[in-house]
From Swiss-Prot:
It is a multi-pass membrane protein. It comes from Lactococcus lactis subsp. cremoris (Streptococcus cremoris). Peptidoglycan polymerase that is essential for cell division. The lineage of its organism: Bacteria, Bacillati, Bacillota, Bacilli, Lactobacillales. This is Probable peptidoglycan glycosyltransferase FtsW. Its EC number is 2.4.99.28.
Length: 198
């Protein structure tokens, strides 16, 4: 029997998101237009950028919502995205300060500057990835976790294996790479997200 996924759409999440996104665009318009005019720049540039990102996010929501659960649990895809994420974080850290694409912002090295668009912070994607990754891990261990409780989550012969082995290694790697940016704020948020998921 084919189920209509529209029946499972959670409007209590979607509608507040759309309302907040709309309010955000209006607020950016009201606060940036006078400043942009004063500087002699395009008054609608920042509003257009924000609107473009909101539309992009809606498209991404639609695409992800239409994905089959099997695709979201695909270990190969998760692994590829994890490697890209960690490499982008390392790229931000090791490139010299004079390199325009990764110039520091407020002393931290976690941003990639994209000409004509703005900045992208890989750590922001790391928060979403951690939720996705841990949800995938725990969904495959559900029966074992119900049976063995916390012992299944921190499985290992030694303390090192219990803390850093198996599925925990990618989480620790992302936390450490983000910490050396230095970006303590995002590191704490990612760590908190991981703990909540556990």
């Amino acid at each position: 029997m084919n189920l209509n996924k529209n029946n499972f759409l959670n409007y209590s999440i979607l509608i507040p998101y759309l309302i907040l996104a709309g309010i955000g665009i209006v607020m950016i318009f009201s606060t940036t237009v006078p400043d942009q005019l004063q500087k002699g720049l395009n008054p609608y540039k920042l509003v257009i950028n924000q609107t473009a990102f909101v539309l992009l996010s809606i498209i991404m929501i639609a695409v992800i919502y239409r994905l089959k659960l099997r695709a979201l649990k695909n270990r190969k895809m998760i692994g590829i995205i994890m490697v890209i994420l960690i490499l982008s974080l390392i790229f931000c850290r090791i490139m010299p300060s004079s390199f325009a694409l990764t110039a520091p912002v407020n002393g931290a090295r976690g941003w990639i500057h994209i000409p004509g668009i703005g900045t992208v912070q890989p750590a922001e994607f790391a928060k979403v990835f951690i939720i996705w990754y841990l949800a995938s891990v725990f969904s495959t261990k559900q029966e074992e976790i119900e049976k063995n409780d916390i012992n299944e989550i921190f499985k290992g012969k030694t303390l090192t294996q219990k803390l850093f082995g198996g599925w925990r290694l990618p989480v620790v790697a992302i936390l450490l790479v983000d910490l050396i940016m230095p970006d303590l704020g995002n590191t704490m948020i990612i760590g908190a997200v991981a703990l909540i998921m556990i």
